[in-house]
Amino acid sequence: MDIILQLGGNPARSETGIELAKAYPDAKVVISTGEHSCLQKYTDAGIDPERVIIDDEAWDTVTNLTHTYKLLKRMNCKSVYVVTDLFHSYRANLITMAVWGCRAPFYMVPYGISVNKKDESYAIGQFFVALLWRLTGVLVYEKRLKEKRKSIYTETEKHSLFELGF
């Protein structure tokens, strides 16, 4: 099974995810974001809401990929198309390798035109956070950051990972 994994609720990412969903009509779509309007964008574009799963527990790239890890493993996916920004793809790729290992069936689908140089050092730090999670199962974050980010995402969607038992 092919999976389209959209990291975050950025409107341009949604547009790219929708294009992929139309090109791969049998693929499931996993949107890892607290932006609940994403599902509506997909359904407005004619994508069956039964194909879409919302992960509303993630608050950054590391949690995007660690929260969806179990789901994607259970779905026995043969390939995962990761939809993200071009400047974000370097970080997302590093974190994907830390979470899934080098054998990951992932393909980055970035859009945009430039790379943010500040993102490189941040990406390396997040790589080690993800690697620590992969080795120990522990996510390490400042408590105040986690609480601040989690307070933004209080609602749940019909197709959330929480309701699916993940």
Residue ranges of each PLM-predicted region?
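A transmembrane-helix-recognition feature enriched in membrane-embedded lipid enzymes
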Residues: K118-K146
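The feature marks non-catalytic terminal segments
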Residues: L139-F166
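A general structural signal for short secondary-structure boundary/capping elements
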Residues: W100, F127-R134, S151-H159
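A structural signal for short, hydrophobic/glycine-enriched beta-strand patches
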Residues: M1-Q126
